[in-house]
Structures are given as structure tokens and as C-alpha cells.
């Protein structure tokens, strides 16, 4: 029986809630639901305490400002939606109570925050009270639920997190009511989705947006419903009740058939074998190869493999992972381009990349595979995301998370809002403590290096305390104090990151030989109180050369950290550049380590930098993890303007890409004094009379551009001068999802002045059109219209100017 520690700091009210809900019991492992057990078992959040360092501070902010303080997030509103059940529209907001509850359970356990614990208990009580007698626990209007329509389109995705949270409440607190609520919710799916009932094909009545009635968006085919196999199999693992296993097997057996309902050529499930064979990429298995959705389905397949021993499932998932890791992982460890996996090597820097939802499930998928296989490659990936992209997506005051976090982008003051990624960000951060340590029959694993204390038991029942003291990854040294209750022989396995070529490890000052990077160092010995392990991971900064769309660019790395040029550390800022490629770095000069103020991931690396045509000057490059911070210190916080540029991939001094970007910037200096009018994502769109054809007006859409399909159009009005030559400039960013379908005419007051074709996502395209004199004669404004070519799309416009002169 594996038990979890209970938080000792509880109020009297919290204790009464424990008694009311039967929370005093400790969850027991179900009868063995594993034919294929994991190689290691992660240590629960309740046994990991005293987090320190940068991760510890971000964890504290997430706990206090976000989960407890509700900074920038209307948590109560979403909980009331579950209680009131009035939602009719297709949307994805019903996941927030489940995401919040699970995050609050983990965080309250790790931090001992009694107020958060009480709030989590109350949330659990309200969610259980809101459950319908038939088991439904979502936000769909009760009047709309029928046997033919038991689910709203996003219910499976939203209730994925609800079911996980209920199971976590049972496993962490021993809550029998939570387990019963979990079973009722799972039984609702068993009773309503199945042979002769509804299935996970999303019938979409509104074909203009593809919103499904049963299982999410039609573009996901069935996978936005089948993802429910993950919490369903977790419930089977917790209870051993066969109906959850059998339902999951039925779902997996129908993935191919449901996928074909959208496209008869698809073999969504079987083609994963082609991915494993190297004959296909995960991005080519289906259209809209949504990363986050794949991850959740893969987790369910792995649980099903463990329960049944069906090795074909493991082969499919591991094959997909090999494909993803070979070409679709950013230097920061994150994944997803426009939320999806692509068919090629495309990893754009400045587009909509590294969705926070995808980062969350990517972390979980790597952790699950690490536990199953003990392959440290998965721990290495977690390390990259944990120290780079996840904190970069987090506002440094704890006030929110970005939807996407570009590797070359613009800083903003607020990351608030109520998107799916907001909930995923605080859930992923809260879950980090589960990734640090693990156990097996022989002993213990140290998987991640974060200042922390863990108290656990060996398979023999002997208690052991491990305490990590480290400034990693700022510093090179990790000290691990090992304190068993009594002297005992066991294995302590310490991960040696693959990036470190020459690690140094000692036990009580004595060096250990034959250390292999990218493996675990197994220290099998008799351990006693006072034993100390020290690991030193030498970090030499180096420039990583880019490939494919990053060819000709470089990225500065030190240890697991990716660095960036950050406008807040540049005198005068970087607010007016069109491209970060106009910022050139001297890769021949050795970077110099410099300290950063408290609150930053550090250290800085001082590097000579040339901005446009200015003389080179030394600039502090800082870790990418700081991308969510727009100021240097509190005194600077309010006066510092946002929208500073930053970039992790940079052009070297003297490179072709830098020379081209500098030429554009110099030309722009001449252009700017002659600009008559301009619109774009940073401007008041309404002042320019936005119009479009068949589709509803949307202004600058959520990604900063309009997209109009075959034959459709959109337009703006721009000012001109009546009797002078006028040039129209149209700035576009690369096409969406790797599909080169953006092709459209440019018309001014109905007359075609040119056309544009926008390539795949990386890069910028400028259209420059000299307007005929008769078009502007006697006018003070014109209408600029973009008309999609047949079978193509019009869009990706982010900058539109009228300029005096030719």
C-alpha cells in the first residue's frame, strides 16, 4: 500500500470538511490493473516540500497570486457555470474548474498553504453537489441534453480535466466522495457513448466554423472525444472496474472508422504504425494534427498498453515520439506550430508557436514515458521545458500565462484572459513537483534538479529524506543530502543530463568514475545519515547553429538554458524594429557571465551586439525563461513601456540575413516621415472602417490577421493625399499551418493594383504598390481590399500603410 503524506497545517474548518466528505482516509492502490508495470513511480506532490530557487519562486507566485489570489482569472465564474448549467454554445471554458482543482490540490500539498487547501476542498464540495443524478458534470444546459445529444461538443475535452481532478482528490486526500463522483461521471460516458448510442464523430451542424455537437471541432476528427480514454483508464487503474477498460478498448477500436467520416482516405490510428516505421510524419496522419489533442490520446493509449500488454500501442506512441523529437521540438523543449505538428522541419520563431496547453500535456506525456521506461531522454525534455518555455509563458508577477510564446516576439504587460492556456499554465506549474523524484523496488531517482526536500519510503518501508541544495541551472553544482532513518543498502539514481559532456559526481567527497551523459548514475551502496552526493555539471556557453528556417541564425545556450537578446536590457529598448534579424551578435567574442537581480533566471551572458547600423555595444543576454518579464525592478515596473522585442534566434554580425534586415530598417527610416496612414494589430481598427464579404466582421482576429476563404474578401479605408504620388505597402507574415494557400488580389477602390502570395509560416512578405494618379486624384481616402483567389485564402496581413511618394 502506498500512502501519501497529509498536510499537517490545517484549520479547524478544514478538518470539519475532511470529516464531512470522508477525506481522512488514504487512497489505496486498486487490485493490480497493470500487466506492464512502470519502471519507476513518481513521488506525489504531498511528499515534496521547501521548493527554492527560480522555480520555487514561480511556484509560489502561481500558488499565491494565481490559484489563491485569482490574479487575472475569474475562477469563480467558471465554477458557477458548472453549477448553473446554462451553456448552449460550443466553447472551451468548462475545463477551468477541473484544471484549477487539480492544480490547487498539488500546490496546497507541496506548499502547505492551508487557505488554498480549504478553497480546494470547498471547490470539490461544490463540484460534487453540482453533479446530475445521471453523472453528468459539465456546463451544458440541462434543457439541451437528450439521449441523442448527451454531450456538448467540448464536453469530453472539458470533463477530461474534471475526471482527472476527481481522481487526484481521491488519490491525494483519500476522498471517497470524489471517487464516487469520478465513477458517476465515467459511467455517464459508458451509458451514453457506445455501440447503438452516440459515437465520437463530431456532427457539425454549423459548417462555417466546424463546431461539433458531440466531440469537439470537426477538424480534430474524433480525437477531441477519444482523448477521454486517458482519465477513463486512470480510473480503471484506480478501481480495477472492467467497464472502464472495455469502454476504452471500444473507443480505440473505432478511431479509424470515425476518422474516415471526415475524410475517407484517413487511417488515423493505423497510420501511427507508418509513423513508427519512419514512412510518415505525425503531421501527415491527419489534417490539423493538433499537438495537445495527440498528447492526451497518447497518454490514454499508454495506460491501455499497461493494462492489456498490447505492445502495438506502445510502438505507436514511441514511434510518434521519435518523429516529434527528431524534427518538431524547439530549442526550449516545447512543441506545436499554430497548435499543431507539421509535416516537415518547420519550427518558426515569430509565429504562433509553443501553445501552453501543448506544453502542459507534453510535460505529462514525457513524464509518463519516463516512468514507464526509465529512459532519461524524457527527463531531459522535461528539464528543457521547465527551465525555458513554461516560465517564459508565465507573467513574472504570477498574473497569467500566454497562449503562445514565440522564440522571437514582443513583450506584453498582461498575459491575463480566460483562454484554455490560462488554466493549463497554472496546472502545469503546479504539477512540476511530481517530476522531481521517483522510486522503484531498488531505491530512488533524482530526475530534476530543483532546491527541495522529499520524504519518502523505500520498498522495505525505511524512510529516507533527500534534500537538494542548488542554484541550478544558474550554478553548476547540486548537493544532495541523504538521510535514511537507519543505515540501509539501496540504489540512488541521479540523472546525468545529455547536454553535459563531462559531469563530475562525488559521494562523501570521493569521485565516481565512468559517468555517461544522458543516463542515470546508479549509486548502489549502504546509505546512512550524513551522506552527501555532489554533482557538478560544467556549463560552457556556446552558439547553436540553426537549420531549415533558422539557417543562417544562431542561438546562445548554456547548460539547459536558451538565451535571448531582451529589449529591456538594451539602452533605449527594442520597440521600433521590424525584424530582430537587424540585431546582430558577435559570435567570435566569448560570452562573459554576469549576475542578474533577484527574480530573474540567470546568469546573464554579456555579448557584443550591433543594432541596425549602430556601433557594436555589449548587451546582457538573459535566459529565455525571463520572456514573461517586461521590467527590470519594481521601480522600473510601471514606467517601463511594454512591447519590447526579444529574440532567441539571432543573426550573426556580417551574415546575409542581418544585412538584408539592416537594409530594410534603413529604408524604413526614410519611409516613416512620409507615412500618411497606417493600420494593423496595434491600431484602432474601427477608425479604418473594416469590412468583409461572406463571413462575419471580426476586426484584427485573435492571431492579429484576417483570413478569408475562396473568393471572399476584406477591406480597410486608409487616408491619402489628393494630388501627390502615393505608395501602398502591405506587410504579411508567413502562411498558417505550413499550408501555402494564401494568394489574393490587392484592389484600391475596386481597381487591382497587384497580388500577393504568402509562403509558409516563417518570415515576412512585403507588397509595395505604386498607386496610379487617377486612383487618388481629388480623394482624401481610399478603400484597400484583399480578394482571395479561387481555392485560396486572403489573409496574414498585419501592416498596411499609405506613404507619400513612390
Where in this protein do the model-derived segments appear?
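Helix-terminus loop motifs that line ligand-binding clefts
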Residues: 72, 100, 114-150, 184, ...
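Beta-strand-rich ligand-recognition modules
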Residues: 510-530, 536-548, 695-725, 731-805
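Bacterial N-terminal signal peptides that target proteins for export
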Residues: 2-15
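Solvent-exposed beta-hairpin/edge-strand motifs
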Residues: 495-507, 746-748
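Bacterial N-terminal signal peptides
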Residues: 13-24
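Asp-box/WD-like beta-propeller blade repeats and closely related beta-sheet repeat scaffolds
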Residues: 143-156, 179-223
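C-terminal beta-rich recognition modules with glycine/proline-rich loops and embedded aromatic residues
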Residues: 248, 317, 379-388, 393-481, ...
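Aromatic (Trp/Tyr) and acidic
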Residues: 29-114, 118, 147-173, 212-218, ...
